[in-house]
Amino acid sequence: MKLSQFNFDLSKDRIAQEPPRWRDEARLMVLHKDSGELEHRQFKDIIDYFGKGDTFVLNDTKVFPARLYGKKEKTGADIMVLLLRELNREQRLWDVIVDPARKIRIGNKLYFGEDESLVAEVIDNTTSRGRTLRFLFDGSYEDFKEALFALGEPYVPEWVKEKVSPEDTENYQTIFAAKEGAVSAPAAGLHFSRELFNRMILKDIEKTFITVHMGIGHFRTVDVEDLSKHRMDSERLIISEEAAEKINKAKRGGKKVVAIGATVMRGLETYVTTTHEVNAFDGWTNKFIFPPYQYSVPDAIVSNFHLPQSTMLMSVAAFGGHKQVMAAYDEALKEGYRFGHYGDALLVL
């Protein structure tokens, strides 16, 4: 398919800058993909569509405070550094993006904190904006991580809100976040509350977790019209033996497997057997799903309403059908649904 087939007009005021007061009270549109029927509900009603033995698969990655503000040595120019991933624990090496990156060269030192207590040296150029930094810190690894993260803030994309608030530290994290490593939060998971989990238990709806450490590749602009030529950034994926068995047990028993979010959709489809079962996995995935594509694992998916031409929209359209999903998005625009990470959700059955 073509990139232009996923375009639509979305004004900035339709992108939610704050979450709803209660996580599970976001709006929920339900798309029945075979008939094209649409329903308008609240997210807490999602359990009405599932029953005993159906299994929700969620991403338990934990967002770390990835955005730092600092200054360049000598000139004192302001810079923003976005931590992408740790490359070497012992040497304090990190893969980062620097903005503005112009004139940030190998050998330059960058200073962070009001007292410039944390210093990093640029040791490599990876892309036009990408750099490898070595943080110069004499204390223990635990002390280093504490100092580094104390200076950071959550990376809430600029198109969501221009300035991060203290509340985002909690709001931009799922209640089940467990394994630190994500720059970006799994948006669909943000809607789950403890009360909703308790109601799932009462209905004998199962849940399990996989880990996908989301970077910023989901936000990267697709710049090719032919989608087969687009390449996704790699993300760390971990599916435990226990999670794989729970998912496969549901499939064998004729129960529904529900993928919560685009990252889970990608993760479940990364390493699948010929009998449509999930294998345990610990590695990297750059799987890019777009129509036409036949999913092997999920029987239903949940996703937020995403921006035009985003890879996440494409993966949803691959499951629900391009025509039906784009019609649902058109309905969402007409009915005042909120888009983006803090926005409303779409359930596709």
Residue ranges and their predicted role:
Residues 1-349:
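Surface-exposed, charge/polar-rich loops and edge strands
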